[in-house]
Amino acid sequence: MRIALVSDPYSPRVGGIETQVRNLGQALSRAGHDVTVITATPSGAQRGDHTEQDGDVLVRRLTARIPFNLPVNPYAGLVLRRDLPDFDVVHIHSGIVSPFARQAIDACVARRIPAIVTWHSHLIDATWWYRFANPLHKWERSGLTLTAVSSAAARAVEKAARGAVQVGVLPNLIEDEPWETSRKRALSNFISEGGAGTRPPYEAGPSRPLQIVTATRLAPRKRVVPLAELTSKAAERGADIQVSVFGDGPEKKRLEALIRNGAPLTLQGKVDANALANAYASADLFVSPVVKEAFGIAALEARACGLPVIYRNGSGIKEFITHGFDGLEVNSDDEMAAAVAMLSTHPQRLQFLRRNALENRITHTWTRGLDTYLDLYETARR
């Protein structure tokens, strides 16, 4: 198939949508498809309509001189209407505010082009205005296939529609490595320590605190400061814990102040995937304090390494974690603090979650999940 992937942001910008679109393009190319990424994100000083190769994927940049190099091009609409019909299918990737994606949607509606739209963001409280700016019901009636990266995100999109629409789930996927190697190593250690029942179970105690990890941007929406506060509450309840935070961002100074006041955190900074996988191999638990996370790539990577996950109700993490089997779902920060304290003092419960996470590989990988995308593309073409 000739496939166009349309996204406002793309490399060299760094973020969730950028990473997913790039990895999707590479996976489709490896499967033998002709892939073009069309983006409004500039690379270097060049502006206008130009192309470059990213491996076997063609990247077409329709860029304009916009302050702060924002991925916005008010002049791209005519080009998209002219050229998108050349593709067998168009896959448009959208956040909450994605003007370039909207131009592509309008082009596909006007030219009756087979297209899928995927929302990578949880609309949260934006639904009240989103419905006035985006005629979702008209898009669906024109033949567009509407999807989101999780059930939680999909329900929010449906809620934002002026009329009834059906939004499917097209989940994010990750590469197998380095996460699978980390899982195998952790599973071997788990068995040798008696985690499979061959020896007395591991117990956290004074010699080894419960090792908790999280990886995120240190920004208010990611709620790392509340994580520091709730883990401090867990420690006050007798939990022997140590939380390693991977990432960087504007909340760093606030976190450093909380650490000086006794919060059981260490800031590890931003590291690459290999370093993160190595850290996960020796950890016990991943915690995600984000409220209404659209998906949770960092949590998926941790789960791929065999870590159970504690997460908030309403999060897209529910797509790949089963409450009580390989993680715990909580409704508040107080419940999260209680769950952390419980796992630190009840090693058998932690062992149960850990064993399930280690012994059951995830299916949300490009090698195991790409057919979900291809099946949807074929359906859209009919």
Regions flagged by a language model, labelled:
Residues 270-271, 278-283:
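Short alpha-helical donor nucleotide-sugar binding micro-motif in glycosyltransferases
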Residues 349-363:
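A short, well-ordered alpha-helix in the C-terminal region of glycosyltransferases
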Residues 189-193, 201-232, 244:
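Conserved donor-binding/catalytic core segment of Leloir-type glycosyltransferases
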Residues 152, 173:
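Carbohydrate-associated surface elements
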Residues 308-311:
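Short hydrophobic beta-strand element within catalytic cores of glycosyltransferases
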Residues 291:
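Aromatic "clamp/platform" in nucleotide-sugar-dependent glycosyltransferases that forms part
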Residues 253-271:
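Nucleotide-activated donor-binding/catalytic signature segment of Leloir-type glycosyltransferases, i.e.
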Residues 323-334, 342-347:
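Conserved acidic donor-binding segment of nucleotide-sugar-dependent glycosyltransferases
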